[in-house]
Amino acid sequence: MDELQKLEYLSLVSKICTELDNHLGINDKDLAEFIIDLENKNRTYDTFRKALLDNGAEFPDSLVQNLQRIINLMRPSRPGGASQEKTVGDKKEDKKSQLLKMFPGLALPNDTYSKKEESDDDEKVKAKPEKHSETHKKTDMSDVDAAMMELEALAPGEGATLVRPHKEVSSRDRHKRRSRDRDTKRRSRSREDRHSDRRRSRSRDKERRRRSRSRDNRRRSRSREDRDRDRDRRHKSSSSRDHHERRRRSRSRSTERRDRRDRSRDCSEKMPPPSAAMTDDPEAGKIYSGKIANIVPFGCFVQLFGLRKRWEGLVHISQLRAEGRVTDVTEVVTRNQTVKVKVMSITGQKVSLSMKEVDQDSGKDLNPLSHAPEDDESLRDRNPDGPFSSSTSMLNLQGNGMEGDEHESRKRVTRISSPERWEIKQMISSGVLDRSEMPDFDEETGLLPKDEDDEADIEIEIVEEEPPFLSGHGRALHDLSPVRIVKNPDGSLAQAAMMQSALSKERREQKMLQREQEIEAMPTSLNKNWIDPLPEDESRSLAANMRGMAAAPPEVPEWKKHVIGGKKSSFGKKTDLTLVEQRQSLPIYKLRDDLIKAVTDNQILIVIGETGSGKTTQITQYLGECGFTARGKIGCTQPRRVAAMSVAKRVAEEYGCRLGQEVGYTIRFEDCTSPETIIKYMTDGMLLRECLMEAELKSYSVIMLDEAHERTIHTDVLFGLLKTAVQKRPELKLIVTSATLDAVKFSQYFFKAPIFTIPGRTFPVEVLYTKEPETDYLDASLITVMQIHLREPPGDILLFLTGQEEIDTACEILYERMKSLGPDVPELIILPVYSALPSEMQTRIFDPAPAGSRKVVIATNIAETSLTIDGIFYVVDPGFVKQKVYNSKTGMDSLVVTPISQAAAKQRAGRAGRTGPGKTYRLYTERAYRDEMLPTPVPEIQRTNLATTVLQLKTMGINDLLHFDFMDAPPVESLVMALEQLHSLSALDDEGLLTRLGRRMAEFPLEPNLSKMLIMSVALQCSDEILTIVSMLSVQNVFYRPKDKQALADQKKAKFNQAEGDHLTLLAVYNSWKNNKFSNAWCYENFVQIRTLKRSQDVRKQLLGIMDRHKLDVVSAGKNSVRIQKAICSGFFRNAAKKDPQEGYRTLVDSQVVYIHPSSALFNRQPEWVIYHELVQTTKEYMREVTTIDPKWLVEFAPSFFRFSDPTKLSKFKKNQRLEPLYNKYEEPNAWRISRVRRRRN
């Protein structure tokens, strides 16, 4: 064995040790080598597992599969084998075939039908005619299928079986109905649900067997009664003189039997037909008829009918009626009254009954989910801790358990006495108590939040079994890190990024400390000064001033006033040229005819041109002028919303039409187009959604993928879809534009398409590097800007930073430093650029600087390619960018500061050479550029969460993800994680195929968990509130905190706080704005962003339109907040966290320590269980938008992901906890230890 093989073998041993440690807590090198030796001798799974069992290793099946997979994957290659050198194509095929064996769930056969053939609301299901006979037969029944699908959607759940009162259903009718149901279900079977139908057919077989057994039992019972009657007749006809007493006893017994039969026959006319044979004992969860035998102050005793033995049970006074509180039992029932009861529990001879869970008229079970009887096989097929399966959850939730929600929402408050209520009212009116501190206090009933300490300690753990289609490769796969986005994690650039994160954290902590000091200095109760008849001097005027501050619009910081120029600011023209002259001055104008000829001659064209050459605005107009719009629209995609809107506005001006007529745009939650639109700009995500409806995009004649070099996740998916579309539609033209020089890769991917180059206006650029690495790149960049301003010739400066927080900090520091230099220094105009800026501030970056002054534009990487700013001669490049990276630990995307690529560095340097010869100051060494930067940026599809992308591909019928034609394929681990996440959301079934719920989730332009939450709210009857919450979550920064009024803004925000959490706080804000007639003055008074609320209103309208199109009911939950919390839990159950005894909370998925954000409504309450919307890394890992939950809901809505822990074993959560001993707070924490005590004595 050579050195390389030894290293490979050691790596394999280390990996096996890690797996054993993760699963069993054993880290033994000898054991790992023994397992590898066993696998080498037993290559098949069965023999390998048997060998492990023979040696006493009772490992779980998932661990055995994982061990064998790792050994086969990492086994050292043997020299001298038959393997020869292979070509690159053969290696790729071998790799794909190897992945196909490892991950069969990623290579399911694609569906051949088109998405357009299905209507949005599932009313018409028309199969595409094909040559296959099976599909041809299905087309004849399409109308019947559509009708039966509607009936299935309207059908009640399994537990809600309707019963005809006072009438027995004949067995013939039952047989006919069952036959019709079976025929209906057989006809409505769809292609993708074929496997799940097999399971349903098995369950129907079990149901038929159970019913047949029930009929046999009834027949045996009737035959037994007939024999009893014959025996009675024989006893009656006997005339023996010696047995008069026995005959008399026999007659009395037969009379009693007849009486019992008559009574049971009378009772059976009132009861629903029995589903099983008569039993001796009652069964929990079943409904029985009975008679009130006795009434006591705390309830009533009911004698049960339909049992061989005499049984009586107690109906407690709380179980008599669901509506309102019962104080007197006789108000509800009377003695000898016939009622219907449900058996809740049986303890020995004591039976607990309930009347409120049974409809007294029809005998219907109002809460079938509790004590739902199931046969053994169905229990074995699903998670035993889940109260219902995911396939029937939507139907079972509809109309069931709502009374329990109302009861649960009622029991979370407690009533207080009248004197206490009076005291609290007086303290609130006097200003001693703030009304916002007691949001649940009711002045009439005196309700206060009830402490939840008395609840039972429930332990929840994650279900370790993977979905069947990911067996051995799901949750057991721990190395789920995406493609590495940093070339050298130990290099100077990575160290500088970490240092900057620490410095920004320190700045945030200082701001938080300053805010706390301002809050402490704020007067606590301003109302006192108004109520007090003899206030102190000037105290009432202080209160008036503080109140008046809220009504005024927010003040702008000093540096921002300087940026926008206050009231004196003027936004003049950048040029005196007309629109026609401006178009003719662009570099692309000279190549107009050549470009049109190239588009006409080629179906696919790659266009390369510098930023500002006119690609985005002119190519679409040229094609429209040449008649390409006669065959369809011209579509142009943009990676950003702001770019799509601004470009469409500019093109509409040049085209000479109103925006939304011939030229329009479509972005998420906003459609500014009309039937006359022929040139349409849109985000790449919107075009991808159009592909969901029509894969071939027949309404378009030309598709232009602009800014393709940015390689967003939507652009990469569109590459594969449009590559297929142009093969099916020869008349469709595809143009791919890029501002960088990676055109060869695009050309090779798109069938070696020709490249059309637009020469730019470039000048030489001098590149300067630092001699030593910079630790604080923010401070170094500001010093560089000041040096350029004070020493270099005239010319504007462009500084690249990573995000809004950094840019605002840089603007503030730079403004203060320039101010400290005095008035003799030439003016430096500071202009920030990021998407959250108001439009008037964004416009100023294009204005030329006044004579004698210089402007510095501080921007994110949007200025690399998307923006063209004239007059830039100097570029300062710290070498960093903020990228979205998928964190496999948290299962979420997070923004991380990383070094840029070499291609991005070249692009930034090119910004200095557009107007004249320029300079680029790179704040890193030349060695770092060469050794620590990747050649090109990592595509977004290789570093982000793919759940939404996989759901969209599945909706388009693309199940074979392994062979989908990606330009750069995403990591297999990311695809597996996305499939596992979709399966836990019930969007995929156990075989990896799309469910009906998943298909409906894909119709909403939301993340999968938000879509699931919105759809489940319909079943939970709270869709009106969830619609508002989702729209508020889709926007950001609802509240604002002016620097000089932070304490007052916090007070205003506190009055909206809800005891349930932040989601309901957002709902309260929107509803309050709505009740105030959407007033702008109300927003200013309460420190709420008016633009954010209006945006949320637009989002809500679009989502409401989608729900109306799908005929989803919009129902309000009223005051029942439990339903809203359940709906939130159904979508975000992965983001559950439990309070940790030591500090903060621990997430259930990865036991990460997190904290409630100080701005949360629950910050001071600290509930036991919470659900969060997202994690934010500032000074700590903070949870944003937090809501309290009941841990039982996690198992209820995610039975495939969570289950109750075994009470006889120590849960994983408690294993990770650390016992902290009590100690004297005045001494050091370890002073209680024996060693410390001895040392102190000595």
UniProtKB/Swiss-Prot annotation:
S1 motif domain location: 285-356
Motif DEAH box, residue range(s) on this chain: 706-709
Family annotation (CDD domains): DEXHc_DHX8, GH2-like_DHX8, S1_DHX8_helicase, SF2_C_RHA
Superkingdom to which the source organism belongs: Eukaryota
Region (Disordered): 75-283, 354-449
Bias type Polar residues, positions: 388-399
Keyword Nucleotide-binding: yes
One biological process term in Gene Ontology: chromosome condensation
Record-given protein name: ATP-dependent RNA helicase DHX8
